[in-house]
């Protein structure tokens, strides 16, 4: 079947729209689908995503499409950009409509709810082994990407040809640098763990602890990410790149991050529900915390920062209690395996 579009994006939120804008601005005909027909009609009418990226026009090559079957028939390249808790649901909806030559890439950052499984496991369980899979990850704020500000990300997958094609599709000398990576596992994990650490950094700043504490959390958060990555077969070098250190620093230090702002509100004494309501969009780190905590417990990996964030979000703990618990931990060598 011939393509009538170069790529189809599933997910018309802020990040899905930003990636679609970048692709279309790079000269690629791009279809974007969302689960709410009214939202897609608004995109068609306004030629912008006023709900998530107000004031940023959609390029002519970006076509909103409300019908999932039409969107999936248009291209064999499918980019999934939905929250992690609906990732499996969207794949189940898409499966009977996928072309036989479909290739699936996602920019979803997270793990499977309740189980903490990597999204590649979810995808394989739903789709089987016939489709090439890939993941995009790295330090990206949707608003900056959509506005054409310089950005860099990484891509890894199960099929080298697909990975290389994605680099060609996404890379733009003017706006987006794309690095190929061979660590499919590591790129998936980094995008989930960094959200948890960003919440902790936000809580620390909300309490008023300052730059020293924030930097310590980022540094030890990277240790936790690396430790968990090693336990599931990721490459340590991945976490010094875009999907590890890069995404971690961005999300922990800039208030464009919903996860950081969520943590700030918690540190200032607001409860979980109020803090989430103030953000007004999905706070991925809320669910990511439970996912990462579940995975770490299953693998027997020590992750003290993650554990304390989990206690605040799910067990009624407070940010002050979390800080006390971390500071009161037994003295250890920085270079030993346990924290």
From Swiss-Prot:
Return the EC number: 1.1.1.94
Look up the record and name the pathway of this protein: Membrane lipid metabolism; glycerophospholipid metabolism
Question: Active site located where?
Answer: 194 (proton acceptor)
Q: Which InterPro entries does the protein's record reference? A: 6-PGluconate_DH-like_C_sf (IPR008927), 6PGD_dom2 (IPR013328), G3P_DH_NAD-dep (IPR006168), G3P_DH_NAD-dep_C (IPR006109), G3P_DH_NAD-dep_N (IPR011128), NAD(P)-bd_dom_sf (IPR036291)
Where in or outside the cell it occurs: the entry states:
Cytoplasm
Q: What class of enzyme is it?
A: oxidoreductase
Does the keyword Oxidoreductase feature in the UniProt annotation? Answer: yes
Residues annotated as binding sn-glycerol 3-phosphate: 109, 138, 140, 194, 247, 257-259
Q: Which UniProt keywords apply?
A: Cytoplasm, Lipid biosynthesis, Lipid metabolism, NAD, NADP, Nucleotide-binding, Oxidoreductase, Phospholipid biosynthesis, Phospholipid metabolism
Residues annotated as binding NADPH are 14-15, 35, 109, 142, 258, 282, 284
> Per the record, GO CC terms?
cytosol
Top-level taxon: Bacteria
The protein's annotated catalytic reaction(s) are:
sn-glycerol 3-phosphate + NAD(+) = dihydroxyacetone phosphate + NADH + H(+); sn-glycerol 3-phosphate + NADP(+) = dihydroxyacetone phosphate + NADPH + H(+)
Q: Which cysteines are joined by disulfide bonds?
A: none
Gene3D superfamilies recorded for this chain? N-(1-d-carboxylethyl)-l-norvaline Dehydrogenase, domain 2, NAD(P)-binding Rossmann-like Domain
The GO annotation for biological process reads: carbohydrate metabolic process; glycerol-3-phosphate biosynthetic process; glycerol-3-phosphate catabolic process; glycerophospholipid biosynthetic process
Q: Does the keyword NADP apply?
A: yes
Q: Which GO terms describe its molecular function?
A: glycerol-3-phosphate dehydrogenase [NAD(P)+] activity; NAD binding
What the entry lists under Pfam families is as follows: NAD_Gly3P_dh_C, NAD_Gly3P_dh_N
HAMAP family recorded for this chain? NAD_Glyc3P_dehydrog
Q: What does this protein do?
A: Catalyzes the reduction of the glycolytic intermediate dihydroxyacetone phosphate (DHAP) to sn-glycerol 3-phosphate (G3P), the key precursor for phospholipid synthesis.
Family to which the UniProt record says this protein belongs: Belongs to the NAD-dependent glycerol-3-phosphate dehydrogenase family.
Matching PANTHER family: GLYCEROL-3-PHOSPHATE DEHYDROGENASE, GLYCEROL-3-PHOSPHATE DEHYDROGENASE [NAD(+)] 2, CHLOROPLASTIC
Protein's recorded name: Glycerol-3-phosphate dehydrogenase [NAD(P)+]
* Organismal lineage: Bacteria, Pseudomonadati, Pseudomonadota, Gammaproteobacteria, Alteromonadales
